[in-house]
Swiss-Prot record:
GO terms for biological process: lipopolysaccharide biosynthetic process. Addition of NAD/NADP does not result in differences in enzymatic activity. This is UDP-glucose 4-epimerase. GO terms for molecular function: UDP-glucose 4-epimerase activity. Keywords: Isomerase, Lipopolysaccharide biosynthesis. It catalyses: UDP-alpha-D-glucose = UDP-alpha-D-galactose. The keyword Signal does not apply.
Length: 341
């Protein structure tokens, strides 16, 4: 599907960029693809990636999604875009909400507009469960990003740039996530700081995150939102699973929720569940393609939203301690940390 094509990954030196490049380099995709453009603002991370991966098909572009000209210039000749650049730390975005807006909303506007201007074939935009019923600046900015993508998708004619969204749960061991923090605290002999023990989060691996984007890329139609069905765990069980894996008896200290944190996350609202397609391991939420002349769209027999539940980290499959341990041991990051323990 990438034969002789050029792919751009915004925020390409982050966790997702590293994961998708690892997948491509271990498969035949890297042999088929014409070029992969890594677009990001951190020259040190780009240089580290260039040296580590050492592949002539990787091209590096310094720029910022906040700057339209830099993203537009880098997108000339691009066939596909994975838009992963974002500010994603919830407490940080609470203190600097305009920075979240500048990157997650206005930056996304620049990426989408540049893609349309350069006649890119398809764009996959990476979103988050925090965009569903958002209560924090990060989630609000990502919800607006989704709305931007869908609004632009609604205006596209057949044959024009296809815009799709993927919505993630918690990606385990990604940069800034809680698993690296817990492992660091275990290794340093410190207390494990847990915000709220009964708080639940979806558990996705970086492999899952790549699978979701590639699934959306292969199957996505104009304006689709894709969600991967994922299990969940409480934060306390996650911490105890890591303690057992590392043979740790560190004390646990409950510190209370941080700014903007929710008790549980939602990946699909009941409103979206009313129109979602169940694709087995995924939900597809099709775009509402109606215009503002609602009278001509009145129909009967639709699903009743009131009878449907949201898809949340509270009502998905809840993993017990043994199951969480087994899942964590499949992660390359955890295996690497075990070897270095």
């Amino acid at each position: 599907m990438f034969v002789d094509k050029t792919l751009m990954i915004t925020g390409g030196t982050g966790s997702f960029g590293n994961a998708v490049l690892s997948r491509f380099l271990k498969s035949n995709i890297i042999n088929d693809i014409k070029e992969i453009r890594i677009f990001s603002r951190d020259e040190k991370k780009q240089e580290d990636m260039r040296i580590a991966l050492n592949n002539s098909k990787l091209k590096f572009y310094i720029g910022d999604v906040r700057n339209y000209q830099s993203i537009d210039d880098a997108m000339h000749g691009v066939d596909y875009v994975f838009h992963a650049a974002a500010l994603k730390q919830v407490p940080t975005c609470e203190f600097y909400p305009m920075e979240a807006i500048n990157t997650n909303v206005l930056g996304a506007e620049n990426v989408l507009s540049a893609a349309i201007n350069n006649k890119v074939t398809k764009v996959i935009v990476l979103s988050t469960d925090k965009a569903v019923y958002p209560i924090n600046a990060m989630g609000l900015s990502k919800a607006l990003m989704e709305k931007l993508a869908i609004a632009k998708a609604r205006m596209r004619s057949p044959g024009e740039t296809i815009l799709c969204v993927t919505r993630y749960g918690n990606v385990m061991a990604s940069r800034g996530s809680v698993i690296p923090l817990f492992i660091h605290q275990i290794k340093q002999g410190k207390e494990l700081t847990i915000t709220e023990p009964s708080m639940t989060r979806f558990l996705m691996s970086l492999v899952d995150s790549v699978d979701l984007v590639l699934y959306a890329f292969e199957h996505g139609r104009q304006g689709d939102i894709f969600v991967q069905k994922s299990p969940a765990s409480t934060i306390e069980v996650l911490a105890k699973a890591l303690q057992e894996i590392f043979g740790s008896k560190n004390a646990i200290r409950f510190i209370g929720t941080r700014h903007g944190e929710k008790h549980y996350e939602s990946l699909v609202s009941s409103e979206d569940m009313a129109k979602a397609d169940d694709l087995g391991g995924y939900y597809r939420i099709p775009m509402d393609g109606r215009d503002l002349n609602y009278a001509k769209y009145f129909v009967t027999g639709e699903k009743k939203v009131a009878l449907l539940d949201d898809y949340t980290s509270h009502n998905t499959k809840r993993l017990n301690l043994k199951e969480v341990k087994e899942l964590l041991l499949t992660l390359d990051y955890v295996q690497k940390e075990l070897k270095n323990a």
